[in-house]
Amino acid sequence: MFYDRAKIYVKGGDGGNGCIAMRREKYVPFGGPWGGDGGHGGDVTFIADEGLNTLQDFRYKKHFKAERGGHGMGKNMNGPAGEDLLVKVPTGTVVREAETGRLIADLLENGQQVVIAKGGRGGRGNVHFASSSNKAPRIAEKGEPGEELWLELELKVIADVGLIGFPNAGKSTFISMVSAAKPKIADYPFTTLVPNLGVVSAGEEGSFVLADIPGLVEGASQGVGLGHEFLRHTERTRLLIHVVDTAGTEGRDPVEDIKIINRELELYDPRLSTRPQIIAANKMDIIPLAEENLARLREEFGEQFEIYPISAATNQGLDKVIHRVAELLAQLPKIEPEQPEEDVMFEPEERFNIKRDIDGNWRVTGKEIERHVAMTYLEEDQSLERLQRIMKMMGLENGLVEAGVKVGDIVRIGDWEFEWSE
């Protein structure tokens, strides 16, 4: 099976915890704090690999987590950084955040790397919290949690030219005659169930990658047949070869076939309607009907498209098509990768949000406050006091009071619960 979609979970490594330690050595009076910092968590990085051509591996492994940073230790020793996790994906993979659809990366080049989930920073050891009023602080930070998110992966094959047309128009025969690709060929619809790629040599004019796009029928843009699954693979192409059954061996009108397929392309993505296209009028070896329909094709589309009579089965006319395609490709620009949207205007997030859960308890959300709570040693009184000061400076205490919190109420922040008291 050909898998071009996957949903996976990734998480950057958590930062290592900072250490609470005191220096206790002979001849060193008032040794003071000596706790080291935690190491930075590892990143989850995707790397494009041209040796891969499917997302099938992600059917069996869906969770990817980088190594956490090492914890700080006494004697002011810092923990080691966590190892980054490299995840190989096929070239042509588009990475989006599953919840929002936000584009994160479009990996087009072999070896291209993108950090998908950053590791958390290491927590600071208590050596950082010494002051004139607190020379032996029992304050340190736990490691910052690494970024985590669910991703939608979508593979769009990378080819210079796409072969489009109705089932049984002869696309698979075409690609098998001009390249080393060996698609399944049979006399029934939907023989081809996966996009087949082949490298085509045009002599001195160079070579190009050709993709046989299967499953295009009327209604494909709305999911009819297999077209909805494979139309995305036309997006990377720079030029389209529209293969049509000129002889009408399947009982269809070749003129209407071209109109239908082009309408489906435009409905799926209006940009495809402007993609350069040539018509390969196939099955010209079946006469006289093919010759009559060729004249109709030229009358209907001659001013809009270049039309080449061919017979893929007998190799008739294929060389002319290939050399013309190579000439056109030399004049066409490369398809640019999708770019993540950039915020034009900076809009600061609210520092926190307060709401009441269905059970009557309070829930506080916000990246900053949740990070502070996650990085606090709540079992240490001094660390807890520091967190309370931070909450007060952020305005959280006043916010809860204004929201109506009462003594004894439970306030949830992240994974922790606190009982409200005066």
From Swiss-Prot:
Gene Ontology CC: cytoplasm
Principal place of residence: cytoplasm
Metal-binding as UniProt keyword: yes
Binding-site residues for Mg(2+), renumbered to this chain: S172, T192
Membrane-spanning parts: none
Keywords assigned by UniProt, alphabetized: Cytoplasm, GTP-binding, Hydrolase, Magnesium, Metal-binding, Nucleotide-binding
Boundaries of every OBG-type G domain copy: 159-330
Xref: SUPFAM superfamilies: Obg GTP-binding protein C-terminal domain, Obg GTP-binding protein N-terminal domain, P-loop containing nucleoside triphosphate hydrolases
EC number: 3.6.5.-
Subcellular location: Cytoplasm
Span of domain Obg: 1-158
Residues in OCT domain copies: 344-422
Molecular-function GO term, any one: GTPase activity
Positions contributing to GTP binding: 165-172, 190-194, 212-215, 282-285, 311-313
Cross-referenced Pfam families: DUF1967, GTP1_OBG, MMR_HSR1
Listed GO biological process terms: ribosome biogenesis
Assembly notes: Monomer.
Family that this chain belongs to: Belongs to the TRAFAC class OBG-HflX-like GTPase superfamily. OBG GTPase family.
Function comment: An essential GTPase which binds GTP, GDP and possibly (p)ppGpp with moderate affinity, with high nucleotide exchange rates and a fairly low GTP hydrolysis rate. Plays a role in control of the cell cycle, stress response, ribosome biogenesis and in those bacteria that undergo differentiation, in morphogenesis control.
Protein name in the entry: GTPase Obg
Species annotation: Desulforamulus reducens (strain ATCC BAA-1160 / DSM 100696 / MI-1) (Desulfotomaculum reducens)
Origin organism lineage: Bacteria, Bacillati, Bacillota, Clostridia, Eubacteriales
